Structures are given as structure tokens and as C-alpha cells.
């Protein structure tokens, strides 16, 4: 029987145009897309997670910082929570190498009633939710 992992995540980031070469929204889209193509995948045996780039409609050519978000959605066959989390963290690090990540959050769960939720807040906690028992446990207290 196959095991499934499901991921839902959003990353907000900023692209800083140090050379002030971005003069149009189209140029910004090209710069972001060129770096976007270099990002690693979050994989499953049937299909990979879908990754979407969302650019703010507002464009001001006098600014040097341009904010955008990346959304990730996937139903990943033959993956564990741990494997998906590792690939997500690799993806996040690569995003941060091209841009400046300002915030991120994710929910990763499986079909065995385990859910991992993270939001980058002041507390910086990862929480495991055991949906079957309605118990909350910290990540370091539970083996996944």
C-alpha cells in the first residue's frame, strides 16, 4: 500500500535590485522566473508539488525591493513527512540564496493522521498534531 504526504506552504520573499536595472514589471517577472527555474523540486513518485510564483500587481520602478510570494501545493505519493520536510527545507534555503525570505509557513501531513505545522513566528515552534488522538506534541518529542 502506498503512503502519501501532503504539503501546503507559502513563502514570502523580497528581491532587491541593487543595480537598479528593473525598469518594468515585465523585467521583474523575467528576473524572478530565471531564478525560479533553478529551484529544486519537492517530489513524489507520481508527480511533484506544484509551485506558483505570485507577484504583487503594484510596481514602482523607483523602488529597489520587490516583494512576492511562492505557494506550494502537493499530494506526494511514496514520501514520508521527514522526506518532504527535508526537500522543503532545501527548497527554502535555495530561495533564500537568490532572494531574501521574509516569512514562511507550511503544513505537511500524511494519511496516518500525523500533521506537521510550522509558522515563522517569535516562538519558532514546529508542532506535530496527532489527529487521531487529538494530541499536540512538539516535533522533538515525536518520532516521524
Where are these regions (language model features)?
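Charged interaction segments
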Residues: 24-144
